[in-house]
Regions:
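Non-heme iron-sulfur electron-transfer modules
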Residues: 52-68, 100-149, 179-192, 207-227, ...
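Hydrophobic alpha-helical membrane-insertion signals
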Residues: 90-92, 96-100
């Protein structure tokens, strides 16, 4: 196979070599002037082109541009704190989550929701969540009694995936579609998920649903499991979850548990917190302020 010979006399850089056995030295400018023909089957052709682009006009390697550090999940330990002393039950968090993550409007399908938990003197916690709290709760004074028992406490309690350190959902998935990342967030691989629903049954917090036919996830897949991901596409680019961003009273706090100055670390130092269903040993990464107990 013959190769084209570049005449040094036509080389605009005058880069001919004195070695009679070697061809002319080709500079970046010469190559770009002649045009580079890409050969798809040639291994490393992309690397070669990148290398040429890094050359200076005289053929010398220039100083490369600094490369931005990529997100390292192993460097983070994301956590979440809900301050029920602050929550006003407005439902903006639910709306923001649905819009950000393409969650169906039907309250049966939700990544986060808000409950009103009314505790009575007999120790019973009564829970209601009309439309998942998406449109807030009816204004007016709190009830003084429920079922003949005096009301001792009323509070709004946002709910979401607990991002458990010992998640029961991952172990039951028959195809490994639900998994835990190095930074502690539970995700669903939509390419693997077969929509069997085992993870929904295994989750003790009711934090999952199957995307119904006719609706889509951000990637456009119906019939797969979906759940809160702390808005993983946002937090891995330095932004806060949509629900945290929109909360008007700062009831939702998010941050890195490895950082003692993060909002969650500060909140957990300054106020007593509980995790839901602690007796199950799931070790949730979501903690609650202002709650002495929880609904059964």
């Amino acid at each position: 196979m013959s190769h084209p010979v570049i005449d040094p006399a036509t080389d605009p850089d005058g880069s001919a070599t004195n070695d009679p056995l070697a061809g002319p030295r080709i500079s970046r400018r010469t190559v770009l002037g002649l045009g580079v023909v890409a050969v798809p089957c040639l291994a490393g052709s992309t690397i070669l082109f990148d290398r040429l682009m890094a050359l200076g006009d005289d053929g010398a390697t220039g100083t490369p541009e600094p490369i931005e550090a990529r997100y390292d999940p192993a460097a983070h330990r994301w956590g979440f704190v809900v301050d029920t002393n602050r929550c006003i039950g407005c439902g903006l968090c639910v709306v923001a989550c649905k819009e950000e993550n393409h969650v169906p409007d039907d309250p049966e399908y939700t990544r986060t929701w808000v409950e009103r938990q009314t505790t009575t003197a007999d120790g019973v916690v009564h829970v209601d969540s009309p439309e998942g709290g998406m449109y807030g709760f009816e204004p007016g004074p709190a009830p003084v009694a429920v079922g003949g028992s005096a009301v001792t406490d009323v509070r709004f309690v946002p709910r979401l995936c607990m991002q458990c350190e010992e998640p029961p959902c991952t172990g039951v998935c028959p195809v490994g579609a639900t998994y835990r990342t190095a930074d502690g967030v539970i995700l669903v691989d939509e390419d693997r998920c077969i929509g069997c629903g085992y993870c929904l049954v295994a989750c003790p917090y009711g934090a999952r649903y199957i995307v119904p036919a006719g609706d889509v996830t951000p990637r456009g897949v119906a019939g797969v499991a979906d759940k809160c991901t702390f808005c993983y596409h946002r937090i891995t680019t330095g932004r806060r979850p949509a629900c945290v961003e929109v909360c008007p009273v700062g009831a939702r706090l998010y941050g890195d548990l490895n950082d003692p100055a993060s909002p969650v670390s500060v909140a957990m130092r300054e106020a007593p917190t509980i995790v839901l269903k602690a007796d199950l040993g799931t070790k949730p990464r979501v903690a609650y302020i202002g709650m002495e107990g929880e609904a059964g």
